């Protein structure tokens, strides 16, 4: 290829991008600002009102900023490209491209120095820190209100002292006019800053820091020291924070656009610059005229304010407003917020070759296809069509090709078909909550204007067809097309990255069709298994098909079939039964099985939504992706076809009301009467009554729901199932709660506050609601809608914070080589397993070797990726805990390693290097948040409380074992009453293996002694679900102590019942209401029982009681409805590491509790714990807190001592990092589990890891760290290694927990932090510290226009070069020549036109 410059290069349009790998930011000095400038702006005018040409020396001056028209000077003496680079001698304008008006800057020489508002107003004030002045004093000096002593000379005044006008005059009179120097305004501040000697200041501050012990002083000195070091290291001077020269940004970045009607639209910056220039010019004039000081001072202050408004309008004083009282947008506003430069233009750009349209369903499509309207495709694929038209010789120039396309000739349509074949397009649906919201498809051209979407991807997009719109994007380059095809094509995204479960699962109609085919009744199955000899026998599946076609048998008829799996090995099939020669099945199931690969075996069961997900997952594991995708398409066709044939529809007759409803409601009312009588007789309190009422109705509703469901399933004994039952049971549409409301009873409703109204709605929608019932319903319905609107925004914001904090976690290496990990176990809620061990260890790397105790074979070895089989085996042999590798313990300096991360859930393969696991984690956690917010909406606000049964029955036969720390006392009935919590009762078999275990609450009555035997379904324990009791450990005579009516206890008489009871109040005095038990004979004290505030006393003074009697009871917290409304804020609270409102106190040591009755310290109770070594450790507890431990209880490190939520910081402090990590992961997961959302632990672990990546320096040693610095753990380790290697003393630090917002702002990259929040503060800090951004994360690279450093842009792949295909050079050369010819042709035409005009 020749070396002559191409036409593009002559026009200054080079193709070579400028590459750089880091960006630094510092404070600019005046000379640098002048060096950027192409001339001084002295004139406030913009353009001439008559000629519309820029004014000379003004804000749009062509001499300074360059010509307004390409290759043409202002006066018109020089035109054309041949004069390029000449400066016109008449008008002084350089002949060049008009594009330079986007690059060339000007400047304004200020008459007096002016302070930069960011450096003194952004807290902490940088100028204030450098001069050790408060922001208020600084402000008074800068705005010409007070004087500051710059140089005290021989006077006793202090340097930097602030003097009012009066004090300054007095000092002048007293010490003489020239004896000291004081000034006001930015000028004086500049002199002060210029006088600072940075090395000396740094040394002084370092010494002060070493010698002070006060934490507050340390903090302040450390801040100053850090700033001084920043200036020193970045070779900048503090006086540059005061401006002598103001830069003027290029005019095309603050354009002035003519509108019709002779008006102009202008950028606000022009107004702000005009104010500055006007005031500056006026001040210059006044200074040359010997004007009085007062006027000049006022003018200087106005100049300062004008410059402030330009940089950050509204930061100081009232904002400068334009027409209609609208504040003008300053330079800071251009950067900040959603509409600012960072988020609007750098992180989110408009994309060329894209379109959007409404979506409709495309049932005829394959999974890898989408229907694209022809008229959209014509525009989207235009460049490819033009290229092909030229290639085939239909046209020779781009212009004529465009004309041909506009005419839509037949050959254009043919070429369009050819061009789109095999060229994937990307479809995106907003809101893009996770990566599956953008997938690639092969376009199928269709008539009409709507995009057609494959039904199986709707789940991933969360799309429905009620008017949703989607955007189409066309990948242009070959590399982009390859990535779209390899990584983004829909068949490659069958599984959810959040949980690894199939996400391309069928829903609604398809599920209904499959269920219709396979559905049978449980009763029939048993019946036919027993007497099946009368059933028709078929040799093969084809025979069954003939019989169906001939209408000899129907889908739901039972048949016998020769087993297609007979004789295979059990390992060869997943579902089939390999032992039977003949299986009993239905004709519908035979048809359902035709589409599945034979390797799965014969699926002989009811198939609903849940089973379908399982079958697809097994199918993928057995036969691989390609055949699974084909099967999915076959399933879609079968499902739609059979759903149509089933004729399934809902009529009002399908909503049958169960006959038991009436009797159940009557029973409930009878129960209510009993409760009311108990309340009237004073046996229970009002709170208990309310809770019992709520529980009675909850149970009644459940009983009616169960009866209704049974009735629907039975369907009056008809052969066909009820359509309503089919829809719900299959999971196609609706749920049991909705059916309950249709024809059961609506049940309890919630008030807007979340409390439950105790009168339920006994009617259902089939019967219709009364006016009152309808009115009560409106609460819930409205709350649902209001919640949805508010929470969607919250959830989106949380996702944004999560992405920001986790964005730089990328898989950087195969293995970091650590032996550390975390120990996981199954998670139980009460006695129900909510997360099995196998589900938690699947796809993770083991840290242990586990051997089968029977056969001796190694099931899992160290560093093995645990697959499903291994996970199940481990569970089978009774392994309860396993240590696995985790991102939390990964020791890689940057990102994490593949071994610590484990499996990539979306592919089921080991995670690849360069995978952006952090962003996947953030999306996996954020995406359901948005769905959960919608959850309240559908049930219409009926209250669902989690009601725990107060009776525990044994599930197995066995021996009952109490753990050693369980303390009980035998009561009068010979049963055992539990006295403490944090202990358990378990049932073991003869071999001593645990079968089940329960954690009893205080006051639980155990019916079987320790070591006793129990049979299955016998009652083991009962407890009071409404109260927390105080139990007497010893029998004797009751004596009240410190129980003074009106001070520590109140006598409450119930208005309705007249029964009175004593309730302990909260009080300020040093009194401790307690119940003392004395021996009946010797009168000696046997036990003290401190009674918490809010407790009702259940014994009388002087009464004789036996051991195990309840002395007092505190009502448990009243049940509110459980709903993600509590959930989303809870997740946010955990991730933001907020301190909970009334956090509990936790044990700082392990040992035995000693409750000292008299001990109080500053109005707080003292709980003492005696450690095994005999040391006593005091814990202070607020007076009104309910203590939940008792005398002689054994507590472990970190156990709760009082009621309330645990503060995460406290856990970190007391129990260390590992315990906190486990706590956070489990708490977050609990919220999602409650909503039935499955997220893999590893995603939460990544976020928790990011929250704990900083340490705070407690002892700097010989390192460069300062006391109280927060630094990355990796940086800390690196510097310590270097220091130790040089023989120095390493620094000491402790881990610190940051919330996700704080952690995002503390990131190493200032560009990433500035684009997140607090833009001005981040940039101010970065510039004064002279920070360098090494462009390692995502956002920095996107902002800089580079490829992201992950996936195919990862550094180890970016060195690969694409080898050009044969003949590529000729094509390039030819296209260059063609382009040159076209440009020349265009220029020639322009010249002719121009000459004609002349």
Swiss-Prot record:
Gene3D superfamilies: 1.10.132.30, 1.10.150.390, 1.10.1790.20, 1.10.40.90, 2.40.40.20, 2.40.50.100, RNA polymerase II, clamp domain, RNA polymerase Rpb1, domain 3. DNA-dependent RNA polymerase catalyzes the transcription of DNA into RNA using the four ribonucleoside triphosphates as substrates. SMART domains: RPOLA_N. This is DNA-directed RNA polymerase subunit beta'. Zn(2+) 2 binds at residues 816, 890, 897, 900. InterPro entries: DNA-dir_RpoC_beta_prime (IPR045867), DNA-dir_RpoC_beta_prime_bact (IPR012754), RNA_pol_asu (IPR000722), RNA_pol_N (IPR006592), RNA_pol_Rpb1_1 (IPR007080), RNA_pol_Rpb1_3 (IPR007066), RNA_pol_Rpb1_3_sf (IPR042102), RNA_pol_Rpb1_4 (IPR007083). Binds 1 Mg(2+) ion per subunit. One of its GO terms (biological process) is DNA-templated transcription. The RNAP catalytic core consists of 2 alpha, 1 beta, 1 beta' and 1 omega subunit. When a sigma factor is associated with the core the holoenzyme is formed, which can initiate transcription. Its cofactor is Mg(2+); Zn(2+). It catalyses: RNA(n) + a ribonucleoside 5'-triphosphate = RNA(n+1) + diphosphate. Zn(2+) 1 binds at residues 73, 75, 88, 91. Belongs to the RNA polymerase beta' chain family. Keywords: DNA-directed RNA polymerase, Magnesium, Metal-binding, Nucleotidyltransferase, Transcription, Transferase, Zinc. GO terms for molecular function: DNA binding; DNA-directed RNA polymerase activity; magnesium ion binding; zinc ion binding. It is an enzyme of class 2 (transferase). GO terms for cellular component: DNA-directed RNA polymerase complex. Mg(2+) binds at residues 464, 466, 468. Its EC number is 2.7.7.6. Pfam families: RNA_pol_Rpb1_1, RNA_pol_Rpb1_2, RNA_pol_Rpb1_3, RNA_pol_Rpb1_4, RNA_pol_Rpb1_5.
């Amino acid at each position: 290829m020749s070396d002559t410059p191409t036409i593009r290069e002559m026009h200054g349009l080079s193709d070579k991008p400028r590459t750089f790998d880091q960006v630094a930011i510092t404070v600019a000095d005046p000379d640098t600002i002048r060096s950027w400038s192409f001339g001084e702006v002295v004139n406030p005018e913009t353009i001439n009102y008559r000629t519309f040409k820029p004014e000379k020396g003004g804000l749009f001056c062509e001499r300074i900023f360059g010509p307004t028209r390409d290759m043409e000077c202002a006066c018109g003496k020089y035109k054309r490209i041949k004069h390029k680079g000449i400066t016109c001698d008449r008008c002084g304008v350089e002949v060049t491209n008009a594009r330079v008006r986007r690059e060339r800057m000007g400047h304004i020489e200020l008459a007096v120095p002016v302070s930069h508002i960011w450096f003194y107003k952004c807290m902490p004030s940088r100028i204030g820190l450098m001069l050790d002045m408060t922001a208020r004093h600084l402000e008074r000096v800068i705005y010409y209100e007070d004087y500051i002593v710059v140089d005290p000379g021989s006077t006793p005044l202090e340097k930097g002292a602030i003097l009012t006008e009066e004090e300054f005059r007095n000092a002048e009179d007293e010490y003489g006019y020239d004896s000291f120097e004081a000034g006001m305004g930015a000028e004086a501040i500049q002199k002060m800053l210029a006088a600072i000697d940075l090395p000396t200041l740094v040394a002084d501050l370092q010494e002060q820091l070493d010698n002070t012990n006060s934490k507050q002083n340390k903090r302040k000195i450390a801040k100053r020291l850090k700033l001084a070091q920043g200036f020193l290291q970045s070779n900048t001077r503090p006086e540059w924070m005061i401006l002598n020269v103001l830069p003027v940004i290029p005019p095309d970045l603050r354009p002035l656009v003519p509108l019709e009607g002779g008006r102009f639209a202008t950028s606000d910056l022009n107004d702000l610059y005009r104010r500055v220039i006007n005031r500056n010019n006026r001040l210059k004039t006044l200074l040359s005229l010997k004007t009085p000081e007062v006027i000049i001072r006022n003018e200087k202050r106005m100049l300062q304010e004008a410059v402030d408004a330009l940089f950050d309008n509204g930061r100081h004083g009232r904002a400068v407003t334009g027409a209609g009282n609208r504040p003008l947008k300053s330079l800071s506003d251009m950067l900040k917020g959603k509409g600012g430069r960072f988020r609007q233009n750098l992180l989110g750009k408009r994309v060329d070759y894209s379109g959007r349209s409404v979506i409709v369903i495309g049932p005829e499509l394959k999974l890898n296809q989408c229907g694209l309207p022809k008229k959209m495709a014509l525009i989207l694929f235009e460049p490819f069509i033009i290229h092909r038209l030229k290639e085939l010789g239909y046209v020779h120039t781009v212009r004529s090709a465009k004309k041909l396309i506009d005419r839509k000739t037949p050959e254009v349509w043919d070429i369009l078909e050819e061009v789109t074949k095999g060229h994937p397009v990307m479809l995106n649906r907003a809101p893009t909550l996770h990566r599956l919201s953008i997938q690639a498809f092969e376009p199928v051209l269709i008539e009409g204007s709507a995009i057609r979407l494959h039904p199986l991807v709707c789940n991933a997009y969360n799309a429905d067809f009620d008017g949703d719109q989607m955007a189409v994007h066309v990948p242009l380059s070959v590399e982009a097309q390859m990535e779209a095809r390899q990584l983004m094509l829909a068949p490659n995204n069958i599984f959810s990255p959040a949980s690894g479960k199939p996400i391309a699962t069928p829903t609604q109609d398809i599920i209904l069709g499959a269920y219709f085919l396979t559905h049978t009744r449980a009763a029939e199955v048993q019946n036919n298994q027993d007497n099946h000899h009368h059933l028709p026998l078929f040799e093969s599946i084809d025979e069954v098909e003939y019989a169906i076609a001939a209408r000899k048998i129907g889908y739901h008829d039972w048949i016998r079939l020769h087993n297609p799996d007979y004789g295979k090995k059990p390992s060869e099939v997943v579902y089939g039964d390999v032992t039977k020669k003949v299986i009993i099945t239905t004709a519908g199931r035979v048809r359902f099985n035709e589409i599945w690969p034979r390797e799965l075996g014969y699926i002989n069961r009811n198939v609903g939504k849940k089973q379908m997900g399982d079958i697809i997952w097994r199918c993928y594991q057995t036969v691989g992706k390609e055949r699974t995708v084909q099967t999915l398409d076959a399933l879609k066709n079968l499902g739609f076809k059979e759903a149509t044939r089933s004729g399934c529809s809902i009529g009002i007759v399908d909503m049958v009301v169960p006959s038991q409803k009436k009797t159940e409601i009557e029973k409930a009312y009878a129960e209510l009467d009993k409760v009311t009588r108990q309340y009237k007789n004073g046996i229970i309190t009002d709170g208990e009554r309310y809770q019992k009422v709520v529980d009675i109705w909850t149970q009644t509703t459940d009983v009616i729901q169960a009866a209704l469901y049974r009735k629907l399933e039975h369907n009056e004994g008809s052969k066909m199932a009820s359509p309503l039952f089919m829809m719900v049971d299959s999971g196609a549409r609706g749920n049991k709660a909705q059916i309950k409301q249709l024809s059961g009873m609506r049940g309890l409703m919630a008030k807007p506050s979340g409390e439950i109204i105790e009168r339920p709605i006994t009617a259902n929608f089939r019967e219709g609601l009364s006016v009152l019932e309808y009115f009560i319903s409106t609460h819930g319905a409205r709350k649902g809608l209001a919640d949805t609107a508010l929470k969607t925004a919250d959830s989106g914001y949380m996702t944004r914070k999560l992405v920001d904090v986790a964005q730089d976690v990328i898989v950087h290496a195969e293995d970091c080589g650590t032996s550390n990990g975390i120990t996981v176990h199954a998670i139980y809620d009460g006695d129900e397993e909510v997360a099995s061990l196998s589900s938690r260890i699947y796809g993770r790397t083991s840290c242990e070797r586990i051997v089968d105790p029977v056969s001796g074979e190694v099931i899992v070895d160290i560093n093995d990726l645990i697959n499903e089989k291994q996970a199940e085996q481990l569970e089978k042999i009774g392994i309860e805990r396993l240590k696995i590798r985790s991102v939390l313990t990964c020791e890689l300096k940057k990102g994490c390693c593949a071994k610590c991360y484990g499996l990539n859930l979306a592919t089921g393969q080991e995670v690849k290097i360069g995978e952006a696991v952090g962003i996947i984690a953030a999306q996996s956690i954020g995406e359901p948040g948005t769905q959960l917010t919608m959850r309240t909406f559908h049930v219409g606000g009926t209250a669902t409380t989690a009601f725990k049964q107060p009776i525990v029955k044994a599930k197995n036969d066995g021996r009952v074992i109490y753990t050693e720390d369980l303390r009980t006392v035998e009561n009068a009935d010979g049963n055992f009453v539990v006295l403490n919590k944090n202990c358990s009762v378990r049932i073991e078999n003869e071999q001593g293996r645990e079968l089940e275990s329960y954690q009893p609450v205080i006051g639980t009555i155990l019916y079987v002694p320790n070591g006793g035997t129990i049979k299955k379904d016998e009652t083991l324990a009962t407890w009071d679900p409404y109260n927390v009791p105080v139990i007497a450990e010893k029998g004797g005579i009751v004596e009240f102590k410190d129980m003074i009516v009106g001070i520590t206890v109140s006598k409450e008489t119930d208005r309705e019942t007249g029964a009175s009871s004593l309730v302990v109040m909260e009080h300020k005095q040093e009194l401790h209401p307690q119940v003392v038990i004395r021996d009946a004979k010797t009168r000696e004290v046997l036990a003290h029982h401190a009674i918490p505030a809010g407790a009702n006393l259940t014994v009388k003074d002087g009464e004789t009681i036996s051991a195990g009697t309840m002395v007092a009871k505190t009502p448990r917290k009243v049940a509110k409805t459980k709903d993600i409304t509590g959930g989303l804020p809870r997740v946010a609270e955990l991730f933001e590491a907020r301190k909970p409102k009334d956090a509990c106190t936790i044990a700082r040591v392990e040992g035995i509790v000693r409750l000292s009755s008299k001990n109080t310290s500053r109005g707080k109770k003292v709980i003492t714990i005696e450690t095994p070594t005999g040391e006593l450790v005091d814990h202070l507890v607020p007076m009104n807190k309910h203590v939940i431990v008792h005398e002689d209880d054994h507590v472990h490190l970190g156990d709760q001592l009082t009621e309330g939520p645990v503060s995460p910081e406290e856990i970190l402090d007391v129990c260390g990092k590992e315990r906190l990590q486990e706590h956070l992961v489990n708490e977050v997961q609990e919220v999602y589990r409650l909503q039935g959302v499955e997220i893999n632990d590893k995603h939460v672990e990544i976020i928790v890891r990011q929250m704990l990546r900083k340490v705070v320096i407690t002892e700097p040693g010989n390192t460069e760290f300062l006391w109280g610095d927060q630094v990355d753990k990796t940086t800390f380790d690196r510097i310590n290694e270097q220091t130790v290697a040089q023989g120095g003393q390493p620094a000491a630090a402790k881990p610190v927990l940051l919330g996700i917002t704080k952690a995002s702002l503390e990131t190493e990259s200032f560009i990433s932090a500035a684009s997140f929040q607090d833009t001005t503060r981040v940039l101010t800090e970065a510039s004064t510290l002279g920070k360098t951004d090494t462009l390692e994360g995502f956002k920095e690279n996107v902002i800089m226009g580079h490829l992201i450093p992950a996936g195919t842009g990862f550094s180890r792949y970016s060195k690969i070069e694409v080898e050009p295909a044969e003949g590529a050079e000729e094509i390039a050369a030819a296209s260059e020549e063609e382009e040159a010819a076209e440009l020349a042709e265009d220029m020639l035409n322009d010249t002719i036109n121009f000459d004609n005009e002349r």
